[in-house]
Amino acid sequence: MKIIIVLFSSFLLYACDNINSELPPPQDGGNFFYPKIGQSIVYDVEDTEYELTGKFTLKTYQLKEVNVSTFKDLAGKEVLRIERYRREKRIDKWIIDSIFTAKKEVDKALKTENNVTYIKIFFPIKEGLKWNGNAYNSFGNDSYEMKKVNQLFQTNGRKFDNSVTIIQQNDSTLVDLKRRMEVYAEGIGLIYREEIKVSYCNSKDCLGKGEIDFGTKHILKFKSNE
């Protein structure tokens, strides 16, 4: 009887090893968020402002984010210093716009801008994962959700095989749209950002047609990296 039990136990261990070997390795997702020191990324940006008069103003410019250096915070954790530059046209010189920081911890990625910290990504990455992006600031609960994990994403004529989309807000009705989302690519970082806050025409002749009365749109797209 002991021999049978031993053999059966060995079979179970062998079977479990085979099953585990076929499972994909866990992916913490750290390589999606500011993965390289010294890396710089150029973005094309479009800001659109809609007025009640029916007119709209479109501004286009470029931003460049440079992962400059790291330092230790008061808790001894490594923090990344990022410099952001701006230019109105491609022929213009880059001018420093702002400086902010980012930090990757065991279970999350943090970004601090204008002294406000946000939880941008949670690790390990997982489809449908939700968290409060404002947990480290005083702005109140802001539910983020992770979608389209490791899926292809296309923007600005470029394809990224492994990306993850973070939905920060997606409230849509017949009379308005409030949407915020960011997309990160493995080995690169942020490749797309969308912030839309518009109100639609709600009179009888245009209700439900998606005609914008007023509001703003901010679209940021990956252009190139170095």
List where the protein language model places each region.
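C-terminal motif of bacterial Sec signal peptides marking the signal peptidase cleavage site
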Residues: L13-A15
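Conserved functional acidic sites
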Residues: D17-E226
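Positively charged n-region of N-terminal signal peptides that target proteins for export
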Residues: M1-I4, N18
